[in-house]
Amino acid sequence: MSWFWVFVGFCLLIILHEAGHFFAAKATGMRVERFFLFFGPTIWSVKRGETEYGVKAIPLGGYVKITGMNPEEEVPPEHEANAYFRKPVWKRIVVVAAGPAVNIVLAFAILFGVYWVNGRPEVDQRVGSVQPGMPAAKVLQPGDRIVAIDGKRFPQASASERLERFAKTVGSHECAGKQVDGCVASTPVKIEIERNGATKTFSVYPHYDKEAERALIGFSYGQKMATLGAGAAASEAGDAIWEVASGTFHVFTHLFEEEQRKQVSGVVGISDVGHQVIEKGLERALLLLAFVSLSLGLVNLLPILPLDGGHIFWALVEKLRGRPVSLRVMERATMVGIAVVLMFFFLGLSNDIGRITGEGFEVR
């Protein structure tokens, strides 16, 4: 059943994206010939007015066909005034940008709703879990509140800063000699906790962890939900969108770095994550839907044809030049763009296969 909802979620995002193009085209006086979900052979269609609506067989996207969007297209004289390339540049940009804009606005709306209703998760000063076999397992229990480490309380720091300083204090205890994985620190950490209303103090010797590159005692903090007002929820949603946008930009501008290439994911990977997330509850499913919608909007704004961003880019070039770009240039730009899109597709597919099976296409 979870796979069904993943499919429904993807369909919803595609429909809303194309609906953005559709309604913007109608609002700017363009003629829309088709509004289809998916590609390939037609499964079902119906015509209402001048537009044919339908569903095709291959679930890899959707499209809105606007009269005159192809420069080589022969437009009947009666539809000439409503053709895409007969409209001013600003109207074309509005129509093309409307699809990604809907995805970004939808992402913001979902994030705002989730943060406003459920609040924001914050790290709690209480122990969430204790790692078996580590020093903390001998003295700490889930629910214990950490009061001080080595007598340090950091009362002026925020909750997250205080916990980070606690961790650095523990990490300052080093093994005698060379720091090797699993070695025991030469000095103990004094932990002051509050348990059932009573204060207790324990001393434990941290173990050096090679991966963390510092000494640890082996516990993690719990989480609590901080209530947010409408303004704070909107700010949190905006911050999340900015973080994803800047991260996406960083990945695409550093694709020659192997670690960044590994961040690219495709339909298979997103579907697999969606399947797992939906089983963990509505909130996580909504958050995933928001971030997939945001990614769909951002990726479509990349300035390469046939993506929406490519159409926006060449419309701006036309505006700056004062005349349309030649058909030959547009064709070459489209060929390059399709090659880049296919590269992203196969790179994402390779990474997805690698994550699921441990093997990929070894793109290096």
Report each predicted region and the residues it spans.
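Divalent metal-coordination and catalytic microenvironments
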Residues: 17, 55, 99, 300, ...
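Active-site His/Glu-centered metal-binding helix of metallohydrolases
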Residues: 19-24, 101, 105, 302, ...
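Membrane-embedded helix-turn/re-entrant segments that form the catalytic/gating core
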Residues: 26-107, 225-228, 315-324
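Membrane interface segments of multi-pass transport proteins and intramembrane proteases
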Residues: 44-47, 126-131, 230, 315-332, ...
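PDZ peptide-recognition modules
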Residues: 74-90, 98, 102-268, 358-364
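Transmembrane alpha-helix interface/packing and boundary motifs in multi-pass membrane proteins
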Residues: 253-258, 293-307
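Small-residue-enriched transmembrane helix starts and helix-helix packing motifs
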Residues: 281-298
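Final/C-terminal transmembrane alpha-helix of multipass membrane proteins
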Residues: 334-352
